[in-house]
UniProtKB/Swiss-Prot annotation:
Lineage: Bacteria, Pseudomonadati, Pseudomonadota, Gammaproteobacteria, Enterobacterales
InterPro entries reported in the protein's UniProt record: AAA+_ATPase, ATPase_alpha/beta_chains, ATPase_F1/V1/A1_a/bsu_nucl-bd, ATPase_T3SS_FliI/YscN, ATPase_T3SS_SctN, P-loop_NTPase, T3SS_ATPase_C
Result of knocking out the encoding gene: Deletion mutant cannot secrete the effector proteins SseB, SseC, SseD, SseF, SseG and SseJ. Mutant is also defective for the secretion of the translocon proteins SseC/SctE and SseD/SctB. Mutant shows decreased virulence in the mouse model of systemic infection.
Name of protein: SPI-2 type 3 secretion system ATPase
SUPFAM superfamilies reported for this sequence: P-loop containing nucleoside triphosphate hydrolases
Job of this protein: ATPase component of the type III secretion system (T3SS), also called injectisome, which is used to inject bacterial effector proteins into eukaryotic host cells. Acts as a molecular motor to provide the energy that is required for the export of proteins. Required for type III secretion apparatus (T3SA) formation, secretion of a subset of SPI-2 effectors and virulence. May play a critical role in T3SS substrate recognition, disassembly of the effector/chaperone complex and unfolding of the effector in an ATP-dependent manner prior to secretion.
GO cellular component terms attached to this protein's record: cytoplasm; host cell cytoplasm; host cell membrane; type III protein secretion system complex
Length: 433
């Protein structure tokens, strides 16, 4: 199995110039290895002897290197030999990956051999700004609460901000069924193994799985794999975009990626500065998120989930991500407790490309819907205690009358898909008749 792993990662001995650099492990911790290994570069792959365990250089101090292993550090000890391989980690990409499940390093998890694929570096540079095509076309998700007031565009990057247990996974499954996408890349980071299997087998339809590449790094995997999973998924999505495809990338979750990156950074000696996160975590986010979006030919529409602690939407990580993305969808615990799914807080949800990808009629209807919800929320407490008096404000009276129909419109089962024509028709029926 280890020999197959080396072959899949395209690692052959000796390195191309015939010169091998050897070193030895000097210190072993739960997360990182400290080795004497002069001449290495950041991101270089290393092989730990006498086995073929792989590790990556994540820090350099003179002749010493900090290595993050691909597997657990259990069983490793001081004095073991380390060989620098003079190459970086490459991941498989290609059409043959559709319908497959791979781990955070690109190795198959579904019991089948890796097909003939191309190989790319995991950390490509984002497309230059002037090479990208502008966002002009809508990407309809089939979810009324999104398409009605926060329509997404092809190539947009959206954050889904949610506390645990309010329907985030179900919403992701609904987004996987987006009718306007040619292919999907789904990455699950830090999830429980049981939930991963149930999500793939029971939440995703068979048709969706056929056009989806699934990257999985469960919570028990090493921190490097949990970090690398998002890079692997982004690299695969870039391959499809560069071939002119409309790709939907769904990442669950960006928070667990950041926590894994924090684990490595703190072990490497970085100091936490903002919200217990080292500066390296925040500096890596823009480069990673900018890799998605529009390209010269195709597009990557990306949805990143962000876990918020205690429903605090202004915590440092959530605030930083919101500033980098092109929109945000906020899930409400209050709506979930009422059995309102998807539990999307329409008034807190925003798409920055909404004015560009929708018609004037659509924008007018969305504004009316938002105003009705806002007016109802202002007097909701008065209604519940019986103190509201009708006739004082006609706009508020209308908002109260249409509120039940609006709630029915915004609710949707996970198997239901609403087309754009039916969406506008229903909005007309609720808001103008």
């Amino acid at each position: 199995m280890k020999n197959e792993l080396m072959q899949r990662l395209r690692l052959k001995y000796p390195p191309p110039d015939g010169y091998c650099r050897w070193g030895r492990i000097q210190d072993v911790s739960a997360t990182l290895l400290n080795a004497w290994l002069p001449g290495v570069f950041m991101g270089e792959l290393c092989c730990i002897k006498p086995g073929e365990e792989l590790a990556e250089v994540v820090g350099i101090n003179g002749s010493k290197a900090l290595l993050s292993p691909f597997t657990s550090t259990i069983g490793l000890h001081c004095g073991q030999q380390v060989m620098a391989l003079r190459r970086r980690h490459q991941v498989p990409v290609g059409e043959a990956l559709l319908g497959r499940v791979i781990d955070g390093f690109g190795r198959p998890l579904d019991g089948r051999e890796l097909p003939d694929v191309c190989w790319k570096d995991y950390d490509a540079m984002p497309p230059p700004a002037m090479v990208r095509q502008p966002i002009t076309q809508p990407l309809m998700t089939g979810i009324r609460a999104i398409d009605s007031v926060a329509t997404c565009g092809e190539g947009q990057r959206v954050g889904i901000f949610s506390a645990p247990g309010v329907g985030k996974s179900t919403l992701l499954a609904m987004l996987c069924n987006a009718p306007d996408a040619d292919s999907n890349v789904l990455v699950l980071i830090g999830e429980r193994g049981r939930e991963v299997r149930e999500f793939i087998d029971f939440t995703l339809s068979e048709e969706t799985r056929k056009r989806c590449v699934i990257v999985v790094a469960t919570s028990d995997r090493p921190a490097l794999e949990r970090v690398r999973a998002l890079f692997v998924a982004t690299t695969i999505a870039e391959f499809f975009r560069d071939n002119g495809k409309r790709v939907v990338l769904l990442a669950d979750s960006l928070t667990r990626y950041a926590r894994a990156a924090r684990e490595i950074a703190l072990a490497a000696g970085e100091t936490a500065v903002s919200g217990e996160y080292p500066p390296g975590v925040f500096s890596a986010l823009p480069r990673l998120l900018e890799r998605t979006g529009m390209g010269e030919k195709g597009s990557i529409t990306a949805f990143y989930t962000v876990l918020v602690e205690g429903d605090d939407m202004n915590e440092p990580l959530a605030d930083e991500v919101r500033s980098l993305l092109d929109g945000h969808i906020v899930l409400s615990r209050r709506l979930a407790e009422r059995g309102h799914y998807p539990a999307i807080d329409v008034l807190a949800t925003l798409s920055r490309v909404f004015p560009v990808v929708t018609s004037h009629e659509h924008r007018q209807l969305a504004a009316i819907l938002r105003r009705c919800l806002a007016l109802y929320q202002e007097v909701e407490l008065l209604i519940r205690i019986g103190e509201y008096q009708r006739g004082v404000d006609t706009d508020t009276d209308k908002a109260i009358d249409t509120y039940p129909d609006i709630c029915t419109f915004l609710r949707q089962s996970k198997d239901e898909v609403c087309g754009p024509e039916l969406l506008i028709e229903k909005l007309h029926q609720i808001l103008t008749e």
